[in-house]
Amino acid sequence: CTLRKHKPNRKPRTPFTTQQLLSLEKKFREKQYLTIAERAEFSSSLHLTETQVKIWFQNRRAKAKRLQEAEIEKLRLSA
């Protein structure tokens, strides 16, 4: 967004391919936290950097937590 102020040397958003996203989601369902070795191997297989995979997993865990909290709130309100 042009209204937001970012560092001029900020890396642009990574456009993940559909196949990468499917692989990332599958791996996340298996395991929400990767070891350094797992992350290195997995990122290499997807042709992504370890940092990209690390950040994707951080964001996905935050999303999972947000969805879980919304579900709990929905159940609480319907009780």
Curated annotation (Swiss-Prot):
DNA-binding segment(s): 9-68
Signal peptide: none
Record's keyword annotation contains Nucleus: yes
Keyword vocabulary terms for this entry: Developmental protein, DNA-binding, Homeobox, Nucleus
Gene Ontology molecular function terms on file: DNA-binding transcription factor activity, RNA polymerase II-specific; RNA polymerase II transcription regulatory region sequence-specific DNA binding
InterPro entries found in the cross-reference section: HD (IPR001356), HD_metazoa (IPR020479), Homeobox_CS (IPR017970), Homeodomain-like_sf (IPR009057), Msh_Homeobox_Regulators (IPR050674)
One Gene Ontology cellular component: nucleus
Family assignment from sequence similarity: Belongs to the Msh homeobox family.
UniProt-recorded name of the protein: Homeobox protein H17
Species of the source: Apis mellifera (Honeybee)
